């Protein structure tokens, strides 16, 4: 921050926070939090306040834990209890027994030249004491869990440091870049937008039109804010490419890099992209997971796109996910599972030793490894392709979901006898579908709508199935377990669930 004191650090709807102002805010908040404040909850809103909170917590030696204020109250309470949170920045997610620390203010240069908010104060001019160590947690994020309770992943500072250095190089960031902050601040993708940008002297741009649901507004915003780097969920990019192709448009001239990730890229959309793009925009396909700190593999698709002009992709082809970044070790097991090792691997799942032992291990050299659950293949040139999951997990809107978590919640409803949840594709988008056998005496006709309301009161929106179908029975395996895939094949073939209650997923926001 000291290298570029008067350059724009954060731009929000045209208003600018300089690196000097951002530094004052961060230092002031760090002093208010005190030394090593532990896990600190933050209401994850799409504003500069959340960016300041993230950096201030890290500067204080604490661990950032984002909580969406829109989550059901019980979900928020369970999350804070699971991580032992005793401090929150701002009152948006405060619970009984949680200390609330208010954000400092600062002067912000607005579009009309006036100044807004109050001064950070004298505390902001003092350097915060050193409170960091490589194994100290940097942030905690939740992934889907089969018990119905989300699993808190603990990411250490060494993982952030190694990953951010690699990403700055991968993206080719300079102080002249303007990077859109698109991802939800609840999900780890936001860190690959925020941290490489602000450690590289570039400008981070937040704007409500990024999530307006209108592609024309989105594209106008990109041009107005002179965005050079876009990091988008693959599902959102699929829809954007369709819009550009249908309207005969191209991305604004200011865009130089587009990063996609979160789920498999559709070869048909890449063919559309190849027809639209002249090679001006660099397109990176990326792979990673919360447990391995953001992006671990990436590939510049210029080469594959050029090859596809001679031999177009077929429907069954798989788009490569690339090679490991410099800080990442990789192994492929005999059954084809990808294992990630090195400094980017998380500490594990907080308070869940069995789940941690199942996924994480350490070799004789002291290298920490994570079993991804993803099956991969390696091409002769060393590039990996994703071949699917080895377990039942599925991605919805770019967010990894364990269907068993949704099943656990649905099974808690008094009208449900049995349930199977699986992932599928509806109208070209990844989605969850649920098949429910009602208890005797339950009102089957209204159960689907009742269950949708029941879930919305308990889980985030991405865990609510797009389709809930009431069925007389589920398919079982030879051992008597519910066969999710078999139940889906049976009831989708019968046309079940095509009527009321079907709902397509929203565009992916990570």
Model-derived segments and their meaning:
Residues 1-17, 88-130, 138-141, 160, 282-285, 300-510:
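AMP-dependent adenylate-forming
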Residues 6-34, 77, 155-161:
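Conserved AMP-binding/adenylate-forming core of the ANL superfamily
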Residues 15, 32-69, 178-183:
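Conserved AMP-binding/adenylate-forming
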Residues 44-49, 68, 173, 183-190, ...:
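Conserved AMP-binding
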Residues 124-142, 149, 173-179, 185, ...:
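Conserved pre-ATP/AMP-binding loop-to-beta segment of ANL
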Residues 151-178, 188-228:
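Conserved AMP-binding/adenylation subdomain of ANL enzymes
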Residues 202, 231, 243-315:
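Gly/Ser/Thr-rich phosphate-binding loop
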